[in-house]
Design a protein with these regions (language model features):
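Short loop/turn segments that connect beta-strands within beta-propeller blades
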Residues: 182-184, 235-237, 277-280, 318-322, ...
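Blade-level signature of beta-propeller repeat domains, shared across WD40, Kelch, NHL, RCC1
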Residues: 437-469
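Loop/turn segments within WD40 beta-propeller blades
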Residues: 160-165, 171, 212-218, 224, ...
């Protein structure tokens, strides 16, 4: 009886066949050996053909399988099966998706923070509480770094900068309006003034231009003159559109309400008028000042602020409510006014003082007397009167100009509780008008008396500092 140890339950048919062939060959070899050894007296022992067959077959299977297994191991070491390649590519794809999602999440977080910051600024701006602190980074300019634009024949009285900061409009006592290119300093267009008595046939002003303003979208330019007229122009082409009449005295102040085409005007007739430029229509008139109005300004709210000259008052006009708030503070004539934001404003007077106001306080928050120094003999000194003021909106930086031929820059204290001098810029002539650009990158001055200049003081921010260039 054969042992089960040699019985193979599952055998490769090919190997079994090969084993049989091997056994047959061995039997033949054994038979031949027997024949050749027939001469010998001792016969050779005949091995069991059955066991030889089983052992031979099993040995043959192992010997043939080992090289194949070793080859298979080599293949696994150096080659990659399609399944493994798919798995590897899938893992790479998942890693890529993970990295993209993480980057997207970071970008979304940054954008969310940026949007939140902008929304917060907009809310503070609407409330009039936004104050960007940039005054500490502003450095005084060198004289060689100030650009001068020449073109008017008589002293410049007013100027504005377009909302995109690409152009400047200036007007003068020669009744002309010039549009300048900021980058090149060249004239883009000139609206010539006419002679007195040619009002019916001349398109433009025939009297000294006292004030001007531009809408926040840059569409309309408005100018006012000594002839009680308000002219409306298309800012892009300088084409004349409308002529507003109604004031009984020279038009001394103009301002568009931000985001609209509602126009506020002030006059020496002591009134404030409201116009709708889109409709080419007059809206209403407001009274209150006891002397000529010397300046006017407005922002987004449906209200405007005015300086009352010799009545020594500043007034806040609430148009919708048809009411006004009256503020007192200066000892002399208040000649200029500018809003810093919806809650705070700055004024200048002929007593040489510059004052900082809140619309919620009837008295100035801060006043600097003799802001531009004094002139005259000892014991008879008189302060240099302040002819113009400007404010970089929603910041802590303001400027004032005087007939002492200097521009003074000021830093507003925390929550607008004080005024600190930064530096002065000497020029030649009366500083009749000052304007900061919308971006805050440059300041423009309109100079009168003998020079009749538009002067650009531009500055750039680099490594945390600001310098006029």
């Amino acid at each position: 009886m054969s042992s089960s140890f040699f019985i193979k339950t599952k055998q490769n048919p090919k190997l079994a066949k090969k084993g049989k062939n091997t056994a047959v060959s061995k039997r033949k070899v054994a038979q031949n050996d027997g024949d050749s050894a027939g001469k010998s007296k001792v016969p050779a022992k005949k091995p069991s053909s059955k066991y030889n067959e089983e052992i031979s077959s099993d040995s043959e299977t192992e010997s043939s399988a080992e090289p194949k297994k070793r080859q298979t191991n080599v293949d696994y070491e150096y080659d990659e099966t399609p399944q493994e390649k798919k798995l590897r590519l899938a893992k790479q794809y998942l890693e890529q998706l993970k990295e993209e999602e993480e980057k997207k999440a970071e970008d979304e977080s940054f954008e969310t923070e940026l949007i939140a910051g902008r929304l917060q600024e907009q809310v503070l701006e609407q409330k009039g509480k936004l104050q960007r602190l940039i005054a500490k980074d502003i450095l005084p300019p060198d004289a060689s770094e100030i650009r001068v634009l020449r073109g008017h024949k008589l002293p410049i009285t007013c100027l504005v900068i377009t909302p995109d900061d690409k152009c400047i409009f200036s007007a003068a006592k020669d009744c002309s309006i010039i549009k300048w290119d900021v980058e090149s300093g060249k004239k883009l267009h000139t609206i010539h003034g006419g002679r007195k008595g040619t009002e019916d046939r001349h398109v433009g002003h025939t009297a000294h231009i006292l004030c001007m303003t531009i809408s926040s979208d840059g569409k309309y330019l408005a100018t006012g003159d000594m002839n009680k007229l308000i002219m409306i122009w298309e800012a892009e082409t300088c084409k004349h559109l409308y002529k507003f009449t109604g004031h009984k005295g020279p038009v001394s102040g103009l301002s568009f309400r931000k985001g609209t085409h509602d126009l506020y005007s002030a006059s020496h007739d002591r009134s404030v008028k409201v116009w709708n430029v889109d409709e080419n229509a007059y809206v209403e008139t407001l009274f209150g000042h006891q002397d000529i109005i010397t300046g006017l300004d407005s922002l987004s709210r449906e209200c405007c602020v005015t300086a009352g000259g010799r009545d020594r008052t500043v007034r806040v006009w609430k148009i919708a409510e048809e009411s006004q708030l009256v503020f007192h503070g200066h000892e002399g004539s208040i000649d200029c006014i500018q809003l810093i934001n919806e809650e705070y404003m700055i004024t200048g007077a002929d007593d040489g003082s510059v004052s900082l106001w809140s619309v919620n306080k009837k008295k100035p928050l801060s006043t600097v007397k003799q802001a531009h120094g004094c002139h005259g003999d000892a014991g008879l000194e008189q302060p240099h009167w302040v002819a113009s003021v400007a404010a970089l909106q929603n910041s802590d930086t303001v400027a004032s100009g005087s007939h002492n031929s200097q521009i003074q820059l000021w830093k507003c204290g925390h929550n607008y509780r004080g005024l600190e001098p930064l530096f002065s810029v000497p020029l030649s002539g009366f500083i009749n008008s000052l304007k900061f650009s919308s971006s805050g990158q440059f300041l423009v001055a309109g100079v009168g008396q003998e020079d009749h200049l538009v002067i650009l003081l531009t500055y750039s921010i680099s490594a945390g500092s600001v310098r006029f260039v």
